[in-house]
């Protein structure tokens, strides 16, 4: 259990850094004597020291089920060790990924610096020279969960998931944390300058400015045009309203020269996602070419039971 306590400390640190994890996003795990301890679906890494967030699963059973294409691997509910897990914890949607990678520790983060490359049409070519010397792999976009795991060939120490985020794997927590930091430094991008403007005509009753970067005009266009990573779509919808195209009371309104306007009653999870949207968009250059989700990819995510479950949890809507 000392290792689990250490994982909790690391998870809380990662979850408290908005440039690495937002709300209930991301997941972490450690393998210990045939047990896979993995963050439960919908739980916040930032709260790892305050409440039980890790589900215990029977690792040999998961690996056997994966080898036999058992449909139970879609949720992994059947492999939960009820004698070790706190009641009500549902395995992470990425449990098969955590189980199938051979390294003892796996950290999956929604690193803003990584996402700012991963959402680009030429993202793989962009990150290749920056990650030179590391054992890494680019993984084309696939719906999270079991389909994503099936696209991975184990053997790398880090994986850049197109339109999604970063996974690192190591045999110790220290090595995994160091690798997250290394990737963040190598992939860091500057914030694009935003014009300074008067808030007159932008401020709206029932809204406030998010604690996030101000956006350049091209960043507003990019962010409004569609969704390009899962949590953006699931918690904010496809794209975002702009100040000159507002209908009703959308959760987020974008205006050039300002951070996102967020509704006063916005729940904690979409509020965090609005900040992440700005953090990513503010790093995109005018000549970048974002790759947005297709209509089918959006449908597959928004109609997936795992995401419907996450949306149903307190603080998500």
Model-derived features with residue positions:
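Glycine-rich flexible loops
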Residues: 1-317
């Amino acid at each position: 259990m000392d290792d689990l306590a250490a994982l909790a400390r690391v998870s809380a640190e990662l979850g408290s850094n908005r440039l690495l994890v937002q709300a209930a996003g991301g997941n972490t795990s450690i393998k210990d004597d045939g047990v896979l301890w993995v963050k439960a679906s919908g739980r916040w890494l930032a709260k790892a020291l305050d409440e039980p967030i890790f589900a215990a699963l029977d690792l040999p059973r998961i690996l056997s089920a994966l080898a036999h294409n058992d449909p139970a691997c879609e949720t992994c509910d059947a492999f939960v060790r009820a004698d070790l897990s706190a009641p009500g914890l549902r395995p992470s949607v990425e449990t098969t990924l955590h189980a199938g990678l051979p390294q003892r520790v796996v950290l999956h983060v929604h690193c803003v610096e990584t996402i700012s490359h991963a959402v680009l049409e030429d993202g793989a070519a962009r990150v290749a020279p920056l990650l030179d010397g590391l054992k890494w792999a680019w993984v084309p976009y696939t719906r999270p969960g079991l389909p994503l795991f099936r696209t991975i060939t184990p053997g790398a120490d880090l994986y850049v998931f197109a339109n999604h985020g970063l996974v690192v794997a190591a045999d110790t927590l220290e090595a995994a944390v160091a690798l997250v930091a290394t990737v963040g430094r190598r992939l860091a991008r500057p914030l694009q300058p935003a014009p300074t403007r008067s808030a007159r005509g932008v401020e709206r009753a029932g809204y406030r400015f998010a604690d996030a970067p101000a956006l350049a005009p091209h960043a507003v266009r990019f962010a409004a045009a569609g969704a390009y990573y899962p949590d953006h779509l699931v918690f904010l919808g496809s794209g975002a309203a702009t100040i000159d195209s507002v209908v009703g009371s959308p959760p987020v309104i974008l205006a050039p020269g300002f951070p996102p306007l967020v509704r006063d009653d916005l729940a904690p999870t979409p509020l965090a996602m609005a900040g992440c949207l700005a953090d990513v968009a503010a790093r995109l250059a005018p000549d970048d070419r974002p790759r947005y989700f297709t209509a089918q990819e959006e449908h597959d995510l928004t109609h997936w039971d795992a995401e419907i479950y996450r949306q149903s949890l307190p603080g998500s809507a």
